[in-house]
Amino acid sequence: MFLPQEIIRKKRDNLTLSQQEIQQFVAGITDNSVADSQIAALAMAIYFNGMELEENVHLALAMRDSGRRMHWKDLNLPGPIVDKHSTGGVGDVVSLMLGPMVAACGGFVPMISGRGLGHTGGTLDKLSAVPGYNPFPEPELFRKVVKDVGVAIIGQTSDLAPADRRFYATRDVTATVESIALITASILSKKLAAGLDVLVMDVKAGSGAFMPTMQKSIELAERIVKVGNGAGVATTALITEMSQPLASTAGNSIETREAVRYLKGDQRNPRLHEVTMALCAQMLIGGKLAADEADARAKLQAALDSGRAAEIFGRMVTALGGPADFMEHYDRHLAPAPIMRPVYADRAGYVGAMDTRGIGMAVCALGGGRRLATDVLDFRVGLSQFVELGQNIGKDTPLMMIHAADEASFEDAARRVKAAIRIDEAAPSELPLVYQIIRGE
């Protein structure tokens, strides 16, 4: 007989749960036979006592199996099923370039993405700025686009890992979001449901990261790599820098515009380019599409230089309902904000530090992000042309450009971004873009 309270008691007492106990509890989350209070109690017990590696694998797999699983074998695809997941940040537009770049090199990328919440932008919101783009296609259309184009970026549907959605909603209101075991199971349940062969994780560190310290970022990356590999997906993680916005823009339409310009070769922010190439390279190596880092980077550069990656992005947009001429006339399709003006520093000096989370919250306050999951976005607004850490600036140097809907929101954003940037007498030491690569053993 299944008694949720006995499973809670075991974990409360720091004992190891069996695969059957975990499967029973997750089934109860899915069919509502387990109460919210019991989910909360188990979450708190796991928060304090953690999970053994094997328990964590069983939890991720049980949540994967709570809903529909995608299968690709029947399509006889001539390459591996690969994907990337980021813990999120500001100006993290990597997915929009990475998907088509990897597809151009022979990978198949069924990317299931999320919307933004709080200071972090969401890949889905950036693509939703494209007129007509359907982020929730029928499963057969999704499979067709992955097969024919090589990449499809869509949103999570209610039938994928439904246990995770209920578990997360409970964690969100019970101060248990930060549990590394539960973050790991939550991320991997959705990725495992997508039927991947290879997963590369981008775990951010710095003032705009989800994890509060470098040590916590490393702990999360190591756990995801171990659990992912334990669940049968070749998983690698990169710890990447998020002490300043990654791209030259933060917002929805403006980040999508930057992604198109990157793919077409019109503008490539060096920091964004390096992180994108590093993540793509690990996907190609993991999928056996490249022998090593140098081989992978050469193939990726060729995909950009030939225009193949840009062509694939355009085909994906069109296949999912967007304009057929999007790549040629993206400026016509992505509406600008009514107000676009710079904000200046109060004094000269070096850009010493950035509160990247604060910069993300400025985008949110402009209307480009969500405080609540139900908020409606203004795709036009955001920030661009950021100064960079270590840059020597004068009082006449713009800190960034603000794209606002009205004067009041411009003034509010200006106050926020000025407060988020520290000007020092001396330049800070340079930070690496990729701190560490963590591979499965």
From Swiss-Prot:
Superkingdom, taxonomy of origin: Bacteria
Any GO molecular function: thymidine phosphorylase activity
Short name of any one Pfam family annotated for the protein: Glycos_trans_3N
Pathway field: Pyrimidine metabolism; dTMP biosynthesis via salvage pathway; dTMP from thymine: step 1/2
Keyword annotations of the record: Glycosyltransferase, Transferase
Family: Belongs to the thymidine/pyrimidine-nucleoside phosphorylase family.
Record note on quaternary structure: Homodimer.
Annotated function: The enzymes which catalyze the reversible phosphorolysis of pyrimidine nucleosides are involved in the degradation of these compounds and in their utilization as carbon and energy sources, or in the rescue of pyrimidine bases for nucleotide synthesis.
This protein's name: Thymidine phosphorylase
Phylogenetic lineage: Bacteria, Pseudomonadati, Pseudomonadota, Betaproteobacteria, Neisseriales
